[in-house]
């Protein structure tokens, strides 16, 4: 009988093990999709948690910015994911190789196949905690090993002493089966959400659905999960503010935002929608349904409490504009956006537990956590809808926190616990040297530069100062020597539960634009903002957003046949 391929052609066995490892990763993706049950998910989490703070800053800073220049979003996270996939492939390949060695000693292909699949399944089940979806990993690896074993023996003479031709057939069989598994795994892993068309139609017929956001409603959730998130018109606990504000719908808010937009070419509208930025600690977003979600309030409270999704939505339904900006956003970056949110004030939940401490730690289902003052949380919002649709999975479905006027890192997504603390502690980013729990820095960004048909130049952007609001934006076209006031978009309206007399949204950005006769050649355009307290945006520019967020005046060189800077 011919000797095993491992003895006669070790290179073929190593290649078979590698291909089986790849097939195991793809098989995991086929059953789990891009969820926490995918084999790469726990590995990326472990890499992130153990990554040195300096390396993590480099990944979310220079690496991410370089990726944006190449048109690649979140390059740092993508590299982390690739590393995790590589490690998973190496782990599975090692286990398959061990199975092949064991099978060689026993001189039976069935041991090789069964052991390869079993070891890979066991490893995937232990790492992900999901033995069912781990079957995909085991099946993928076992299939490649099985095809390699059987193709090697096909047509092999019984009295041959050479395994070379059989080894080649084994390699070709491994390669073909790995390609087949990869194609099938890609198709299955990217299968449409299990949210049914009927549920999607139900959400869209509530009268306030933004098609863009509704379409991204939490893939992988159950059929009822997309129904009526933020759209229920029969809520009995809507509070009457006395000014008719509760009569407004999401469509009304969106219409006002469109009307008040300056309509500048190349400038994002006042409502971001699907373009809303996304920054997460983990590569794979949690996949939590409304039915399984709950929020616990624990710690230094008179009585701890748990709230389900139905409990939160029964407390009322408020609409409000809200802008978020990430503390890692560069001075003229794009990690700042605005939308219409549906939810309830956090204070309604806190009054039931009577908190005794002065600080809180907000925790997420993905292991993220951030600490800040209880007083700040009292003015915050629990959002369960966005632009008339359910809160998308990537933005915290089913419920997230929104902390007005503060850096986005404390607006925790996939919120599942509020722990009241007696004293301060460090959150995830503070443990890594950041200080992003306070109010946002005032900024005026310069994102649009247009040469108009009449020969004039138009520059425009967004401006934001948190709850301080924006009083004016000033533009200089001579490098800061002289200043002119820009045109501002109208203030967005207050929320449906705003106090009587409120004239504008508490926490929303504005657009600005300035049109002028350009001088000959290149010239430097500088922009700065004055907030609602009359305070001028600080001029000194930081080298990076770390640790307190970017500051400075945005400047660009314009003219001379193009835009520079």
Regions found by a protein language model. Name each.
Residues 160-179:
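N-terminal secretory signal peptides and thylakoid transit peptides that target proteins
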